[in-house]
Amino acid sequence: MASQQGQQTRKIPEQEKKDLDQRAAKGETVVPGGTRGKSLEAQERLAEGRSKGGQTRKDQLGTEGYKEMGKKGGQTTGDKSAGEREEEEEED
């Protein structure tokens, strides 16, 4: 993935790179997944790291576990035990 993004960057004309870098410095996201990067290069690195992190979790959990993790992402854990939540899910 890193080499792919690096190759994409090299194909961009120098003037366009400068423009993207300036926009990134102003806080604009110019690379998908590069949120909060303060330069074009920083945004590329952030996007690559986020992609690798997600892939690693998917590999560790398997496809089904990864999907299940996404479904439960918004649920709070402080109010009920896992068993109580599971019982409620079975009722629905």
From Swiss-Prot:
Tissue: Maximally expressed in dry seeds. Also present in mid-maturation embryos.
Recorded coiled-coil stretches: none
Compositionally biased tracts (Polar residues): 1-10
Biased composition (Basic and acidic residues): 11-26, 38-71
UniProt region (Disordered), positions on chain: 1-92
Inducers of expression: By abscisic acid (ABA), osmotic stress and heat shock.
InterPro entries membership: LEA_5, Sm_Hydphi_plant_seed_CS, Small_hydrophilic_seed_prot
Protein family: Belongs to the small hydrophilic plant seed protein family.
Purpose of the protein: LEA proteins are late embryonic proteins abundant in higher plant seed embryos. They may play an essential role in seed survival and in controlling water exchanges during seed desiccation and imbibition.
Protein name as annotated: 10 kDa late embryogenesis abundant protein
Organism: Helianthus annuus
Classification lineage: Eukaryota, Viridiplantae, Streptophyta, Embryophyta, Tracheophyta
